[in-house]
């Protein structure tokens, strides 16, 4: 095993994980018999504790990859090469499997109302009104286990919820639990029984039966986006509905070797879907289905990039990501990764999907989808007193075929709620800034090297390109790669903030924007009229 390479990959992964994935990983270690990690917030340090306990680097990597992938964490193909293809959490570490399974079950309940109802039910019936809003989801599942609500091979306490929300869940878990093998490489629970941390004290305050926003949702001062629920968005009249989070069980991962994808599959791929950040990739992968004749989406690490091959609507596609870290955002990494993917596949069309910032405050609202008919490259600018000027004055046109497909009729602005051409994504507020309906606009975007969060600087961008509806960071590079390979490209992104100094306040709009853009592209690629493109 290349320990140095693994350490480097884990350091990089640790920088990218959010607090939820750290909480889940910590819960899995608790299930594996590792104690005393309650305050640790670094994935890398948690992994070190795991590796110290197992004394087996490959086992520790296998365990880690399993946990992160189960909850939709992406960009792990290279690390997965060091994992064992035979690793089975359920048979080796049944307690950890139980805790992760129940967390996944509750986490996947959408919308928020369903999840809140389920947690209120568990709290009221089994936990004497324990206030589940006072802890995170993984912490609540730990309380459930410590109080005997769930046990290895026995989740019957959740039977009514399972039948209501996911009928197959009970049978799936019971089948796995039959295979449990308590001869784990980890220290067994019996061996550490005397050192087991006591169950958290249940506070006196009671969970009410009221359905409310969960802990961690935006404050009342900022209008909240609707919870998209890991892709639980439907297109009216569409034959494809995305209801489940992207899950490692849907993916073929090359463990130590690359799976050979047939030439027929490679030649049949006409679309490259490019994303930048993890949330953008997640929005696309949640809607990616296995290719016809396959049970799983294909995940590969080739030419130095992570690739995902599957079906998006009616079309086989390859999905790429250019920014695994914040430092990789921007035009140059996007161009580099796009070129690498184009060396492997020969798609006719490139679609960049993700999040942008709104430029035109009169017309563009948070959550709206922007279809770029042109990309104005503001990477090459001249800075003058009080203003900036684009040195490349001609904006790059998006592909005619793609613009024709994705732009909407009737002034390029149409509501996307309700009728046959509208997808079911509704905003919660009725004020002007966050208009209730998601709208689709078609017009120019600017592509900048900066992550813009300053109203004054945005005003300068607006003066440089007064026709621009939105701005983003990767489009210019993707358009350059498309030119090099003589293919069409387009940027379709949804507004996640207004670049006016309030990015932190808007942060909960970013997941919604990722879902909106991904869903809009899916809506059109699922149209029978696109089959012969």
UniProtKB/Swiss-Prot annotation:
UniProt record, GO biological process: L-methionine salvage from S-adenosylmethionine; nucleoside metabolic process
Region (Disordered): 184-248
Any single GO CC term annotated in Swiss-Prot or TrEMBL for this entry: cytosol
GO molecular function: adenosylhomocysteine nucleosidase activity; methylthioadenosine nucleosidase activity
The keyword Hydrolase is annotated on this UniProt entry: yes
Feature: compositional bias, Polar residues: 218-227
One Pfam family, short name: PNP_UDP_1
Disulfide topology: none
Reactions that this protein is recorded to catalyse: ATP + H2O = D-ribose 5-triphosphate + adenine; dATP + H2O = 2-deoxyribose 5-triphosphate + adenine
Biased composition annotated in UniProt, kind: Low complexity: 236-248
Segments for region (Purine nucleoside phosphorylase domain): 263-533
EC number(s) from the headed UniProt entry: 3.5.99.-
Sorted UniProt keywords: Hydrolase
Region annotation Death domain: where it falls in the sequence: 1-262
Job of this protein: The C-terminal purine nucleoside phosphorylase (PNP) domain cleaves the N-glycosidic bond of ATP, and to a lesser extent dATP, to release adenine and a sugar triphosphate; has weak activity on ADP and AMP and no activity on dADP, dAMP, adenosine, deoxyadenosine or other (d)NTPs.
UniProt domain comment: Has 2 domains, an N-terminal death domain and a C-terminal purine nucleoside phosphorylase (PNP) domain; the PNP domain has ATP nucleosidase activity. Expression of the C-terminal domain alone leads to cell death in E.coli.
Name the record gives this protein: Death domain-containing ATP nucleosidase
Native organism: Amphimedon queenslandica
Gene (UniProt): 109585858
């Amino acid at each position: 095993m290349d320990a140095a390479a693994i350490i480097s990959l884990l350091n990089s992964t640790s920088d990218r994980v959010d607090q939820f994935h750290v909480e889940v990983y910590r819960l899995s270690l608790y299930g594996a018999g590792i104690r005393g990690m309650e305050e640790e917030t670094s994935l890398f340090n948690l992994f070190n504790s795991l590796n110290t306990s197992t004394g087996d680097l490959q086992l520790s990597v296998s365990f880690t990859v399993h946990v992160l992938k189960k909850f939709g964490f992406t960009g792990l193909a290279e690390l997965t090469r060091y994992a064992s293809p035979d690793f089975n959490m359920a048979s080796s570490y049944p307690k950890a499997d139980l805790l992760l399974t129940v967390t996944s079950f509750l986490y996947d309940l959408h919308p928020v109302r369903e999840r809140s109802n389920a947690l209120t039910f568990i709290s009221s019936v089994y936990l004497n009104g324990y206030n589940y809003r006072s802890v995170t989801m993984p912490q609540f599942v730990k309380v459930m286990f410590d109080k005997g609500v769930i046990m290895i091979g026995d989740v019957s306490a959740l039977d009514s919820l399972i039948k209501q929300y996911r009928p197959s869940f009970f049978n799936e878990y019971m089948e796995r639990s039959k295979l449990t093998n308590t001869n784990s490489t980890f220290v067994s629970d019996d061996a550490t029984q005397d050192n087991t941390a006591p169950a958290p004290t249940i506070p006196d305050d009671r969970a009410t039966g009221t359905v409310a926003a969960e802990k961690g949702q935006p404050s009342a001062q900022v209008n909240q986006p609707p919870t998209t629920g890991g892709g639980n968005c439907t297109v009216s009249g569409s034959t494809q509905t995305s209801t489940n989070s992207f899950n490692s069980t849907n993916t073929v991962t090359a463990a130590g070797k690359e799976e050979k994808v047939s030439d027929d599959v490679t030649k049949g791929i006409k679309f490259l879907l490019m994303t930048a950040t993890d949330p953008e990739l997640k929005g696309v992968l949640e809607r990616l289905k296995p290719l016809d004749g396959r049970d799983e989406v294909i995940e590969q690490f080739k030419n130095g990039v992570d690739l995902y091959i599957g079906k998006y609507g009616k079309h086989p596609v390859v999905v790429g990501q250019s920014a695994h870290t914040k430092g990789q955002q921007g035009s140059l990494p996007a161009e580099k990764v796009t070129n690498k993917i184009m060396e492997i596949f020969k798609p006719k069309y490139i679609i960049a999907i993700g999040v942008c910032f709104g430029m035109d405050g009169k017309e563009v609202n948070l959550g709206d989808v922007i279809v770029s008919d042109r990309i104005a490259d503001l990477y090459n600018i001249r800075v003058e007193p009080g203003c900036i000027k684009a040195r490349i004055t001609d904006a790059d046109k998006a592909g005619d075929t793609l613009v024709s497909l994705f732009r909407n009729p009737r002034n390029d602005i149409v509501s996307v709620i309700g009728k046959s051409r509208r997808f079911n994504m509704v905003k919660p507020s009725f004020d002007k800034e966050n208009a209730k309906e998601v709208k689709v606009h078609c017009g120019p975007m600017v592509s900048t090297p900066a992550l813009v969060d300053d109203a004054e600087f945005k005003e300068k961008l607006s003066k440089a390109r007064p026709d621009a509806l939105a701005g983003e960071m990767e489009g210019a590079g993707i358009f350059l790669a498309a030119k090099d390979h003589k293919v069409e490209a387009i940027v379709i992104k949804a507004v996640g903030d207004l670049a006016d100094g309030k990015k932190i306040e808007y942060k909960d709009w970013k997941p919604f924007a990722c879902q909106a853009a991904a869903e809009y592209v899916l809506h059109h690629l699922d149209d029978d009229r696109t089959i012969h493109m």
